[in-house]
UniProtKB/Swiss-Prot annotation:
Organism: Pseudomonas putida (strain ATCC 47054 / DSM 6125 / CFBP 8728 / NCIMB 11950 / KT2440)
Membrane-spanning ranges: none
CDD domains: Ribosomal_L30
Top-level taxonomy: Bacteria, Pseudomonadati, Pseudomonadota, Gammaproteobacteria, Pseudomonadales
Protein family membership: Belongs to the universal ribosomal protein uL30 family.
Name of the gene this protein is made from: rpmD
Protein's name according to its UniProt entry: Large ribosomal subunit protein uL30
């Protein structure tokens, strides 16, 4: 399965609760933290919801 690198580039402070949960669900903890997640429809949905706080590669 393909993977995608996701980096948190903006703070989750003051954001919508559902968007905070999406960032947490992706495994991101702090600004600048990068994780590699599988490219599944579930992960893509979380990325699409919180796209304005994330940088996606791959």
């Amino acid at each position: 399965m393909a993977t995608v690198k996701v980096t948190l580039i903006k703070s989750v402070s003051g954001r919508l609760p559902n968007h905070k949960l999406c960032v947490k669900g992706l495994g991101l903890r702090r600004i600048g933290h990068t994780v590699e997640v599988q490219d599944t429809p579930e992960n893509r949905g979380m990325i699409n919801k919180a796209y304005y706080m994330l940088k996606v590669e791959g």
